[in-house]
Amino acid sequence: MEELIVELRLFLELLDHEYLTSTVREKKAVLTNILLRLQSSKGFEVKDHAQKAEANNLPAPPQMPLPEIPQPWLPPDSGPPPLPTSSLPEGYYEEAVPLSPGKAPEYITSNYDSDAMSSSYESYDEEEEDGKGKKTRHQWPSEEASMDLVKDAKICAFLLRKKRFGQWTKLLCVIKDTKLLCYKSSKDQQPQMELPLQGCSITYIPRDSKKKKHELKITQQGTDPLVLAVQSKEQAEQWLKVIKEAYSGCSGPVDPECSPPPSTSAPVNKAELEKKLSSERPSSDGEGGVENGVTTCNGKEQAKRKKPSKSEAKGTVSKVTGKKITKIIGLGKKKPSTDEQTSSAEEDVPTCGYLNVLSNSRWRERWCRVKDSKLILHKDRADLKTHLVSIPLRGCEVIPGLDSKHPLTFRLLRNGQEVAVLEASSSEDMGRWIGILLAETGSSTDPGALHYDYIDVEMSANVIQTAKQTFCFMNRRAVSTSPYLGSLSNGYAHPSGTALHYDDVPCVNGSLKNKKPPASSNGVPVKGKAPSSQQKKVETAGGVKRTASNAEQYKYGKNRVEADAKRLQSKEEELLKRKEALRNRLAQLRKERKDLRAAIEVNAGRKTQAALEDKLKRLEEECKQREAERVSLELELTEVKESLKKALAGGVTLGLAIEPRSGTSSPQSPVFRHRTLENSPISSCDTSDAEGPLPVNSAAVLKKSQPSSGSSPCRGHVLQKAKEWELKNGT
């Protein structure tokens, strides 16, 4: 019987893992009940027999044993569970239940991934959120880890805080006295953020669609708002009620019109909120930051919400229907600390921004700022209290360029050793950072003298112009004089109004004369003329009127354009040689074809006629192949000539030492090039008493210097091709 009971119990346990129909499940339940009854009755019989045998064998005890006192049943919420021995998983969270009088604080644990909560898409609907909320509730894990945090707290809960780019992060929010304390975890002893509620205004923004949340926006004068997401309307009203009670304990004045009860307010009109967007100023770059201990919200989200001000609160809050409850207490305004201030509107040039930094062969985006002649790299704009790297800039050298894949890259070198590799997002950003770094490193290098080998001419001009203007602004803003401010060779080192766009032109006698030379066609400011002694040396050596300042000004892109021009010239020479050899071969083939035709006519009717005809066919096939090769060669040569013409046209601007091939009728001949350099606005400004030649339009000079013929080059090329094909068909 006992063996049958054991086997039956094992069989029922096996059935628990199988799929059963409703009828079989009912039969299984009946068998289980019978088996339990049999086991219970069998157990009582065995126990009675054992007690009787023990009573017969043992002597009588001196006294009756005390009956066992059953342990009192304790509810699961009577005491805190023990701390886990192993470390908590990475995605472990604790969600606090709102604290009520006479109740112990509770929390909800969940192990969902934090990345899912930080997603900016917010695509979970209300039903999914309700399903996730059904989790086991129990007390805080330990008394020393959590009870001190919520001791004397008016309300506490885990709320979502909006970060920049619309991401959300979970914080433990506790209101004690008149302060809002935010903890990253319930085990932290120090709050991550502390916000005094005095002088703040709070706005409740209800959920208007399934993709948004119930939000509480707490705004303090002079700082960006703190946006917290609550789970429901009831929870928002509870927080508003507690905050109102906290206001009553503040020392500041309370405006009765600014604190209506939550129950009397109706939903906010969305159109009315969007109507008053102009009263809210978005953040400088559309991103969040941390100022004065208050985490700012995203710039895009900030533009969609109305920012309540003190003047509006007194006159319009009572008229606006909805859940918007503005509470302003006191006039205290806390100024942001200098450590947390990233940029100021009073600065001419912002010395901070995001850059890509090359670290361990990987590019990472970092928030970079220049302070006290140091380049400080932060992991994020919101984390300014800690930094990753601090690089002293004095004595460093700024070198633009890294490779062709990263054209907007610049490097910092100290004693020839690479200190940092940075990449900007645009040419303006690159020029701004180069100007800032040149000014902070104490370098007297002109931004135009640097080599920009991986960007084109137009982008190089933009980078140089922005770098020079930034360099001037930084030097003008500096309080103390630097060694590179007094250099006369670098006009952009003088913090004057003229230096923003033009150089201070040094004269022969050593005095400075603010003479505005004409700007070039591409908008790049023109450098001044060097002393006459240096000019004579340049004219004697090169035969072209070009000053040293000019050569230094337009040195950007020189290596790249020179290499392109040389490559095109060598390719043109190679194609011309191939064309000449092909022409000679075609002439030889035509002569052989003519001789073969004459030989066929002479040997008509003979045995050698067939061999001669086969040879003539092979010769004609070769002639066709050579002719097709000549046509493709002509097209390639035309393309190379056009590219070379463009490169040489840019050579005038860049001051290249490349001369066109002799014997060509190109408008870039040495004589024309000499005349263009003398008359163009790129040439040096004459500082002598005699008036120099007036600057003329370079484009007009190029247009007038084109060879005037009855037909255009394109038309002549087509006529030449037609004539060649007619001659070929005729032969």
Curated annotation (Swiss-Prot):
CDD domains, A to Z: PH1_AFAP (cd13306), PH2_AFAP (cd13307)
Coiled-coil ranges per UniProt: 558-649
Modified residues (Phosphoserine): S283, S284, S549, S665, S666, S669, S680, S688
GO molecular function, one term: SH3 domain binding
Residue positions of motif SH2-binding 2: 452-457
UniProt biased composition (Basic and acidic residues): 271-284, 721-731
Residue spans of biased composition, Polar residues class: 678-687
Motif (SH3-binding) on chain: 70-73
Compositional bias segments (type: Pro residues): 59-84
Post-translational modifications reported in the UniProt record: Phosphorylated on tyrosine residues by SRC.
Residue window of motif SH2-binding 1: 93-96
Any single GO CC term annotated in Swiss-Prot or TrEMBL for this entry: cytosol
UniProt region (Disordered), positions on chain: 56-90, 118-139, 252-318, 513-544, 658-731
UniProt keyword annotation of Cytoplasm present: yes
Residue numbers carrying N-acetylmethionine: M1
Lineage top rank: taxon: Eukaryota
Segments for region (Interaction with F-actin): 595-638
All copies of domain PH, residue ranges: 152-248, 348-442
InterPro entries from the UniProt entry: AFAP, PH-like_dom_sf, PH_domain
Alphabetic keyword roster: Acetylation, Actin-binding, Coiled coil, Cytoplasm, Cytoskeleton, Phosphoprotein, Repeat, SH3-binding
Biological role stated in the UniProt entry: Can cross-link actin filaments into both network and bundle structures. May modulate changes in actin filament integrity and induce lamellipodia formation. May function as an adapter molecule that links other proteins, such as SRC and PKC to the actin cytoskeleton.
Subunit record text: Monomer and homomultimer. Interacts via its C-terminus with F-actin; probably involving AFAP1 multimers. Interacts with activated SRC SH3-SH2 domains. Interacts via its PH 1 domain with PRKCA, PRKCB and PRKCI.
Protein name stated in the entry: Actin filament-associated protein 1
Source species taxonomy: Eukaryota, Metazoa, Chordata, Craniata, Vertebrata
Name of the encoding gene: Afap1
